[in-house]
Design a protein with these regions (language model features):
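Basic, amphipathic alpha-helical hairpins
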Residues: 1, 14-27, 46, 50, ...
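Basic/polar phosphate-binding segments, predominantly the helix-turn-helix DNA-binding elements
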Residues: 25, 29-61, 81-106
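Terminal helix-turn-helix DNA-binding modules in bacterial transcription factors
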Residues: 49-89, 109-126
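Short non-domain terminal segments
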Residues: 12, 20, 84, 93-94, ...
């Protein structure tokens, strides 16, 4: 077994990679390959050190990004799809609903303030 310090360093490197790449790469294999380890080992170490799996962390970063784009930008859903490199609106919608219980549009309507809604509707359709 590796010393805990090595596992913490590996986890830290994983987080650095995720922060730089989660918008374009959501595959555990990508991060494992970047760190020259197997996906199984990466998942085990990250879970041991942080309490969550590598996939869960990647997903969490992506959901936070999507929530931010939905509530703090005037981008429409198609523009968000392109910015986050989902294959289409359906795949983004399924991913978002699976992790939040709401569609992207439901989330946007629920969390935009009245002022934001007014400004947003001038530029876009919700």
């Amino acid at each position: 077994a590796l010393p805990i310090l090595h596992k913490k360093e590996l986890t830290h490197k994983f987080f650095q990679l995720v922060m730089s790449n989660y918008k374009v790469n959501r595959s555990v294999t990508f991060y494992a390959n970047s760190l020259c380890i197997t996906p199984k080992y990466l998942t085990m170490v990250v879970k041991e050190v942080s309490g969550k799996s590598a996939k869960d962390w990647i997903t969490e970063y992506m959901i936070l990004e999507l929530k931010g784009l939905l509530t703090n930008s005037t981008l429409n859903i198609q523009e968000i799809v392109e910015k986050t490199q989902f294959s289409n609106q359906s795949s983004l919608g399924r991913f978002f609903r699976r992790h939040t219980g709401l569609s992207p549009l439901q989330y946007r309507k629920k969390y935009l303030t009245t002022e934001q809604r007014t400004n947003f509707s001038k530029n876009n359709t919700i």
